[in-house]
A protein has these predicted regions:
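Ligand-binding pockets and gating/stacking loops
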Residues: 2-467
Length: 467
């Protein structure tokens, strides 16, 4: 995919409409654009999924054999393999160039050996994966970095996903702080209507939503004018009013952006085969692809600079009918010694990488407004699991794939970094990866994310990934 020149695109009427929200932002703040996308796969990503041929050779093919986990052979100090053909890994072939698609191998970094046993591992670590803390004990990295990245976007973060739960909103993966879970929209039809409702349905729908906020705001203002209760109750009303005013302001901003975002919208739920034909229970991968469509529009349209896509992490017994019918993720993992199950597990991880690669290529083909390069240059995409390296994880290892963000200082140039295994002096932790993202977000003092306490091995970012 060839990136259009900024001059050619922006001179066209379509280009002006398409990038109006980003042009507005660039004019408002002359700072380098920065974005973050985090993708989680539920219930484990096995290290072999990300092990390139070069990394296998470096560690000793005979030492690994057919093992799917092999941290025992990791080096005593971090080993960086540059110019690595990461697409040779079992589940990373979607990064290779094919059928007119650009290669993303030279835009990627694979990290093996990072640990985070403070989270507890298990089937799922809940908010632990993104907080480097005990489940429910701290804010997750998306919530911490979103305010730093938001700038003029109407949404600080968009959180989407899939789940085996029957509810359309779940709360187990992201958190604003201790015991303050953040909602994730796990039904793509609801996500579409919630995010794009007033944009997709036109000015009338937007006016109706604004009128509802105006009515509620006037009602609270009238109550406050005559309120004689205690100060705590008054504070609650004042916070409610502030929330309504924020929502009303966002609705007005969305209305101003509608014309430029409408051409980017994915198919409406009733017309989208990924939603309409997903079955019951829905094929999690079809719904996830629909959520990726929504996320892509949000990024291209300037609706947010922070996205979380949580695949089954808040209810992990999801189904993948397009890959292996009738069996849920939990039973699939328990039967991993069955060749068909292992093949399916690898195919599921590979599908996640394919969806990530599609997003990355779209961003790579889109010129950044207000800075040089493409949107991918200014967007860090991180793919990892919600519990570590296997079905019943201890948090001993969290394989990770990082794409893009080279303009933010990330060394995503086609490298694999292998860290010593947990328990070794030079092991590094997932919190170091998140510290790296904090530095990439522009905060040079972001060095102690996570609640490891005395078990923290080292502060700061990963020097092999950032600098």
């Amino acid at each position: 995919m060839t990136m259009l020149t900024r001059r050619t695109l922006l001179k066209s009427a379509a280009g002006m409409a398409l990038f109006a929200p980003l042009l507005s932002e660039a004019a408002a703040q002359a700072v380098s654009p920065r974005r973050l996308v985090i993708v989680l796969e539920c219930n484990g990503i096995y290290p072999v999924a990300f092990l390139s041929a070069g990394a296998r050779s470096s560690l000793g093919s005979a030492n690994i054999g057919s093992d799917i986990m092999f941290s025992r052979v990791y080096p005593a100090t971090a080993r960086t393999l540059t110019g690595d053909a990461v697409g040779s890994a079992l589940c990373l072939d979607p990064l290779k160039a094919s059928s007119g698609k650009i290669s993303l191998e030279n835009r990627a970094a694979v990290l093996l050996g990072l640990s985070s046993n403070i989270t507890g591992g298990g089937h799922s670590s809940g908010t632990g994966a993104l907080s480097c803390a005990v489940n429910g004990a701290a804010a997750t990295i998306d919530a911490v970095l979103a305010p730093k990245l938001k700038r003029t976007a109407p949404y600080d973060a968009i959180r989407l996903g899939t789940s085996s739960a029957a509810t359309p909103i779940v709360y187990e993966t992201c958190s604003f702080g201790p015991k303050r879970p953040a909602p994730i929209l796990v039904n793509p039809a609801l996500a579409y209507d919630s995010i794009f409702g007033s944009i997709a349905k036109g000015a009338t729908a937007g006016a109706e939503r604004s009128a509802l906020f105006d009515f509620a705001r006037a009602d609270v203002q009238a109550t406050l004018a005559t309120f004689k209760g205690n100060s705590n109750e008054r504070t609650k009303l004042e916070r409610y009013l502030a929330s309504l005013e924020g929502l009303r302001a966002r609705e007005a901003q969305l209305a101003s952006m509608a014309a430029s975002v409408q051409p980017l919208l994915p198919p409406a739920p009733a017309d989208n085969p990924l939603i309409r034909n997903a079955g019951s229970p829905p094929d999690s991968l079809m719904w996830l692809e629909a959520q990726f469509q929504i996320a892509t529009t949000c990024l291209l349209g300037g609706l947010t600079n922070t996205v979380v896509l949580a695949s089954g992490s808040s209810g992990f017994d999801v189904h993948y009918e397009s890959i292996i019918p009738t069996i849920g993720r939990h039973d699939l993992q328990h039967g991993i010694d069955t060749p068909a199950n292992w093949t399916a597990i690898a195919a599921v991880t590979r599908k996640h990488v394919e969806l990530i690669a599609n997003l990355a290529r779209t961003l790579a083909a889109t010129p950044e407004v207000g800075a040089s390069g493409s949107m991918l240059d200014h967007t860090a995409i991180v793919f990892m699991s919600d519990n570590g390296e296997q079905h019943h994880s201890t948090g001993a290892e969290w394989p990770a794939l990082v794409l893009g963000g080279n303009a933010l200082g990330l060394r995503t140039d086609g490298r694999t970094v292998i860290y010593p295994e947990m328990g070794q002096a030079n092991n590094r932790q997932v919190s170091n990866l998140f510290n790296t993202l904090g530095h990439a977000a522009g905060d040079a003092d972001f060095n102690t994310f996570g609640n490891e306490g005395p078990t923290r091995i080292a502060p700061g970012p990963l020097s092999e990934l950032y600098g």
